[in-house]
């Protein structure tokens, strides 16, 4: 069975709208595994982790995004992501 990203995104958005954040996290995790360069999904996933109090997981998602931006030459975006991380964990 092939992965339908559009359907998964729609399902995840529905879960967020319903306040079912843990279910949304699971959907976004599946999407992130299927497309590891989708920084929008990773950012949304990180934001959801923050919302449910899983700061460590959020930082992991945001670090992945920052590294992607660094490797692709988008240094200002990488710095912005690192600033987002520093707000979650000032140390």
Question: Can you describe what each PLM-predicted range is?
Answer:
Residues 1-91:
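Repeat-based scaffolding regions
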């Amino acid at each position: 069975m092939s992965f339908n990203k559009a359907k998964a995104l729609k399902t995840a958005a529905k879960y967020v709208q319903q306040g079912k954040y843990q279910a949304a996290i699971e959907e976004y995790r599946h999407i992130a595994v299927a497309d590891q360069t989708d920084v929008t999904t990773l950012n949304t996933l990180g934001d959801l982790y923050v919302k449910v109090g899983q700061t460590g997981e959020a930082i992991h998602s945001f670090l992945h995004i920052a590294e992607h931006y660094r490797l692709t030459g988008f240094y200002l975006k990488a710095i912005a992501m690192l600033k987002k991380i520093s707000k979650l964990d000032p140390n």
